[in-house]
Amino acid sequence: MGIRNLTEWNDPIFRKTSRTVEKFDERLWNLLDDMRDTLEKVNGYGCAAVHIGVLRRIVVVNDDNGVIELINPTITDASEETQEVQEGSIAPGAPRGYVIRPKSVTVSALDRNGNPTTVSGADFLAATFCHEIDHLDGILFTDKVRKKNI
């Protein structure tokens, strides 16, 4: 497939709401493969489609067990227990900062074939799910930052 160019951090596209995916076809599969390749190239933890200029509700997350693809994801459960996590972005020019996130979350989504799937994550994986899903609604981690990391 291919490696896509990343959208610059200050691009206004990051403030837009991504659209729901309705077609599960070769075009979507190519996009998912490109997102995986791009994430691997930059050695990142997560990539929302908006990172490559596509306003679709798609997230790809790197996990110890491989890459998790989430289409139209929704956080369906979040722990009351929280954690402070240092976050940044694969977007060029992004700052870093500390954000409070749930310690664990459960996400409902669709897989690349349109089948329902549920994944759970704790610690950094939970924070990554939250961070990337926020992007789909035009929310940046800097909106939630408690202290910046200079």
Language-model segments: what does each one mean?
Residues 1-150:
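Positively charged
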